[in-house]
A protein has these predicted regions:
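Glycine-rich portal/gate segments that line the openings of hydrophobic small-molecule binding cavities
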Residues: 28-31, 37-79, 83, 127-140
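A general structural signal for short secondary-structure boundary/capping elements
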Residues: 7-8, 49-56, 66-67, 97, ...
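Beta-strand/loop substructures that line and gate deep hydrophobic ligand-binding cavities in soluble
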Residues: 76-127
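A short, structured loop/turn motif at beta-sheet edges
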Residues: 10-15, 43, 64-69, 87-96
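Beta-strand secondary-structure signal
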Residues: 5-7, 49-51, 72, 85-87, ...
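Hydrophobic ligand-binding cavity/cleft-lining segments
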Residues: 1-43
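Residue-level detector of alpha-helix boundaries and kinks
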Residues: 2, 12, 73, 113-117
Length: 140
């Protein structure tokens, strides 16, 4: 298991950043380097199942609203399964976005686990945190 955390101050209200992230219709625009499109398959209470047209092919993501400041995303891919905890903590008129990942590599990729954490951190920052921050801050 690889555990990684990236935290960033965002100059936008927490509810704006959450709304961007929570809506899969935004994902292709927010995360164009990795996502071509996304469609909601079903909603049940606080859970949304999303089919994502990812650069690696079609994958399933499950979004769960855990609390007013937290959204979890479970992702199933060919090389790994991962849980991402997204925390949106207000800081005055801005917020702190913290993304925590728990990544379970599949065989044979599991053998590389001791060397993969820096790559996981870099991709979290480049493909999720930075694009989400840029989109939220540009909506002023």
């Amino acid at each position: 298991m690889i555990d990684a955390v990236v935290s960033e101050h965002v100059n936008a209200p927490a509810d704006r950043v959450q709304a961007l992230y929570r809506n899969p219709d935004n994902w292709a625009r927010l995360f164009p380097a990795t996502i071509r499109g996304a469609r909601v398959v079903r909603r049940e209470g606080d859970t949304t199942v999303v089919e994502v047209d990812h650069v690696e092919g079609k994958v399933v993501n499950i979004l769960r609203d855990i609390s007013p400041t937290r959204i979890d995303l479970v992702e199933f891919k060919r090389r790994y399964d991962a849980t991402f905890v997204n925390e949106f903590i207000p800081e005055g008129e801005a917020m702190r976005y913290t993304l925590t990942a728990s990544v379970r590599l599949k065989w044979p990729y599991r053998l590389a686990a001791p060397f993969v954490k820096p790559l996981v951190l870099a991709r979290m920052r480049r493909y999720v945190v930075e694009p989400l921050k840029a989109a939220a801050e540009s909506q002023r």
